[in-house]
Amino acid sequence: MRALRKIIVTKKGGYLFEADIRGYFNHIQHDWLRKMVAHRIADPLILRLIGKWLRAGYMVKGVVLRSEEGSPQGGPISPILSNIYLHFVLDLWFEKKIKKSCQGEAYLTRFADDFVVNFQYRNDAEEFQRNLTDRFGKFGLELAEEKTRIMRFGRFARVHLGKTGQKPDTFDFLGFRHVCGTDRGGKFALVRIPSVKSRRKFLAKTKDWLRKHRHEKQQDQQKQLTLMLRGFYQYFGLHHCHPKLNEVRLEILRQWVHTLRRRSQRHRLHWSYLLKQPWFDLPTAVAVLHPTV
């Protein structure tokens, strides 16, 4: 997040390429991955162990099925192998070939299988998209066309589009919605707030927990909801986020009220009564938890 912010705020980037890899973890090619790992590891015992891990397969109705592609999910080594795969397929290729062929500046930001690329010129972004499709195809990967786009984004995009009354697009990355905004002095500022998807996912989690534990003591419910909410605050505690975080807090309180009413069959359990109870309270979000990100 810090690296992406630095690129958007300080570098020459008026265009942003956003993409999604379709079923990435299910389409990693084992042969290619073995070659990539062997490029840095010479110990045959470790290479054999990794091969066994990849061939572990999965079980359906008591029958073990093995696959020649994909990385087994759920284990500690799977994220490492998946990251190695994209390091060779995308990262090194971008640094050694794409950046050298671009007319302007270009910067790749990747975390696991999520990535965005900032370009100074649109022609470079379009050429990259064409080359990336071919590059991924060579290694068994495919871009999700419905989630792949080139947009105007950044401080230069804001100035140019502002002349015609338009605004830059927004994009989601690592759970945050990224927006071109301004600071108090009217200068460009990157605004990041929890995305709609991340908020809905978290609220679905709290709703499900309340449904399963609606008969627990109110004090125990309050303790667990506080832990969940503080974890959410801890991740999303950036500039501009606290209004959305407090909206999430209010929605959880509504979920809690609904659960209490269902449990007691007291549909007239009013807010005025609950707000007087010492246990009916959840922590509010502070303005900034991570000021340097």
Predicted regions and their residues:
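Non-catalytic terminal/accessory segments
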Residues: 1-293
